[in-house]
Amino acid sequence: MADVLERVTKIVVDRLGVEETEVVPAASFKEDLGADSLDVVELVMQLEDEFEMEISDEDAEKIATVGDAVTYIESHL
């Protein structure tokens, strides 16, 4: 999990301009990290590129926190 979490954290820090210490599994992209809907779409696209996978729109809607993203990615690698 650490490797996936580290990679997700780097993407979130780069995309949202937040501090690395703010990017914890329980952090909500919108409420805690200040992402808007477009930011979330762009994050999902960047995660797809980074992990060479496709995340369906239906699944993307369920990814609300950093932990959700890590869990989803780990279960689909």
Curated annotation (Swiss-Prot):
SUPFAM superfamilies in UniProt: ACP-like (SSF47336)
Cross-referenced InterPro entries: ACP, ACP-like_sf, PP-bd_ACP, Ppantetheine_attach_site
PTM annotation (O-(pantetheine 4'-phosphoryl)serine): residues: S37
An example Gene Ontology CC term for this record: membrane
Transmembrane annotation, as ranges: none
Domain Carrier, residue spans: 2-77
Subcellular location: Cytoplasm
A GO BP entry: lipid A biosynthetic process
Pathway entry: Lipid metabolism; fatty acid biosynthesis
Keyword Metal-binding recorded: no
Keyword annotations: Cytoplasm, Fatty acid biosynthesis, Fatty acid metabolism, Lipid biosynthesis, Lipid metabolism, Phosphopantetheine, Phosphoprotein
GO MF assignments: acyl binding; acyl carrier activity
Xref: PROSITE patterns: CARRIER, PHOSPHOPANTETHEINE
Modification after translation, per record: 4'-phosphopantetheine is transferred from CoA to a specific serine of apo-ACP by AcpS. This modification is essential for activity because fatty acids are bound in thioester linkage to the sulfhydryl of the prosthetic group.
Family to which the UniProt record says this protein belongs: Belongs to the acyl carrier protein (ACP) family.
Function: Carrier of the growing fatty acid chain in fatty acid biosynthesis.
Full protein name: Acyl carrier protein
Organism this protein belongs to: Bacillus mycoides (strain KBAB4) (Bacillus weihenstephanensis)
Lineage per the UniProt record: Bacteria, Bacillati, Bacillota, Bacilli, Bacillales
